[in-house]
Structures are given as structure tokens and as C-alpha cells.
A protein has these predicted regions:
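Short acidic alpha-helix initiation/capping motifs at coil-to-helix transition points
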Residues: 42-43, 78-81, 115-117, 156-159, ...
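Alpha-helical scaffold segments that form or flank carboxylate-/histidine-based iron centers
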Residues: 77-92
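Short, amphipathic alpha-helical segments that act as regulatory/interfacial helices
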Residues: 85, 102, 139-142, 233-236, ...
Length: 260
């Protein structure tokens, strides 16, 4: 995975999960020392509408993106082991391949419960299309959940940084994967995946920057979008997909295609 960028099964750009994380997030201990809080707002259809209105009022560039490319829609992702395992399946493969593997895995483990996944043999998991590394990541994640190191019940009590710290204990779950999971599976409203290439490219064009911003600069730009950075990320992804030539939008730009 080193030095590579790829799209995952959501059509988002998954970065190298080991890419200078300390520089981007202010050090490896930041999330571990974050206080516990309970997020009060969930990004749903109603709050997304409110978020987009507030973002457009506060940032003319966001208003322009919404006018030119249309409004984004929310994306769905399973919660729990299934959601994180789906992210692992989607790492470093095409959208089509990830979907095929995931459907076979769902058929083999209908409950998508950690204990049932652990009961599968390597041969069975290999037969559905999982690589050796992804089997290892899946087993590690399932074990962490079964043994209580990752608790989805307590996840709701943690602020974003602490939740990311908990999830990234598992092998194969880096900050980007954890952030995407919290955004789409739990509706966390104020997350900006600073390592996402799609967001970087969109922000460069939206803000008319001469060069692509690094993660640190993107996060600095995104400070102006609090407390709706997740909604701003949806705007940027949608803007990039519907303005491929950064000229006239596609004829279907006003209708967001549901992520797969």
C-alpha cells in the first residue's frame, strides 16, 4: 500500500494509511488523550439540509459549488463489525471487485457477527476473495471486538478523536477508514478526512489554490466549516464528481447518484 492512492468501494480515494499521520494530526497521542463526550447531533437528511444552508451562508465557495454541482446526498454504511469489514474489503481494489467480494462474504457470513467471522476457515475466506492481508485484518478486528478492546456501545460516548483512537487499534483500520466509518455509519457531523485525495483535489479547485493542499492545510481550510465538516466533505466529493472538467456541470449534476 505504500505510496499508493486508490478508490475504495464508496468511490472515495483511500490514502496510504501510514502516510505521515503524526504530521497531519498533530501527533500520535492526540486522540488518546481526548476527553469523552457524547455527540449531540447526527447528520441525517434534516440536519444535512440545515448544514448545507449554514455552510453556503458562511462560505461563498461552498455556495458556488452547490449552485454549480447540486446538493449531495447522505451515504449509507453498516454499523459495527460489518461496516468496518466492508471498508477493509474495499481497500486497494476496484469498486466492482469490492462489491463482488463483499456480496460473497455476506453470503458466507450472513450475520456478519465477529464470532461467526472468526469461525470461518482461511480456505472459506479465501474462496470469497479475501487476500491473506485482509483475512488477517478481519480476524484482528473481530478479535478486538470479541475481547472488548473495541466496543461499539461505548463508541457513542466518545468524541471524534477518542472514537478514532479506539477504532485504529485494529490492524488495517487507519485514521481515514475510521473517519469514513464514523461519518457514514454513525452520522458524525464534524469530520474532515484530511488524507482523502478526492477532498484535496476538490478543495484546490474550489479555493482556486495554485497547488494541492496537503492534509494539514486542508484541515486548516476546513476549520471554517465547523461544526459541519462532514457535510462540507460531502459537498467537495459531489463537486469533484459532477465537475470533472471544472467547467459546465454534467446534465445529471443536480441528482446525486447513491454511493455503492
Amino acid at each position: 500500500m505504500q505510496g499508493r492512492q486508490s478508490r475504495n468501494h464508496f468511490g472515495l480515494h483511500m490514502p496510504n494509511l501510514q502516510f505521515r499521520l503524526a504530521a497531519c494530526y498533530g501527533g500520535s497521542n492526540m486522540a488518546k488523550t481526548a476527553p469523552k463526550t457524547t455527540p449531540q447531533i447526527v447528520l441525517d437528511k434534516k440536519t444535512l439540509k440545515k448544514a448545507l444552508a449554514e455552510l453556503a451562508a458562511a462560505d461563498p465557495d461552498i455556495a458556488r459549488a452547490l449552485d454549480e454541482a447540486g446538493h449531495p446526498e447522505l451515504r449509507d454504511m453498516p454499523t459495527g463489525f460489518g461496516g468496518l469489514m466492508r471498508s477493509i474489503v474495499g481497500q486497494q481494489v476496484s469498486v466492482h471487485a469490492a462489491r463482488s467480494i463483499w456480496l460473497r462474504l455476506e453470503a458466507a457470513v450472513p450475520s456478519m457477527e465477529p464470532a461467526d467471522f472468526l469461525a470461518m476457515s482461511d480456505e472459506q475466506l479465501r474462496a470469497v476473495g479475501l487476500s491473506g492481508a485482509k483475512m488477517k485484518y478481519g480476524r484482528s478486528l473481530a478479535t478486538d471486538i470479541v475481547e472488548g478492546r473495541i466496543s461499539f456501545d461505548s463508541l457513542h460516548e466518545l468524541d471524534d478523536a477518542a472514537a478514532i483512537a479506539m477504532l485504529t487499534q485494529a490492524k488495517g483500520i487507519g485514521p481515514w477508514t475510521a473517519e469514513i466509518y464514523l461519518m457514514f455509519a454513525h452520522g458524525r457531523p464534524d469530520i474532515m478526512p484530511g488524507l482523502d485525495l478526492g477532498l484535496v483535489v476538490a478543495a484546490q479547485h474550489l479555493k482556486k489554490l495554485r497547488t494541492r493542499p496537503d492534509a494539514k492545510r486542508l484541515l486548516k481550510i476546513a476549520e471554517a466549516w465547523r461544526p459541519w465538516r462532514s457535510a462540507a466533505a460531502l459537498v467537495l466529493w459531489h463537486y469533484r464528481r459532477n465537475m470533472p472538467d471544472w467547467g459546465a456541470p454534467r446534465s445529471s449534476a443536480k441528482t446525486e447518484k447513491k454511493a455503492t
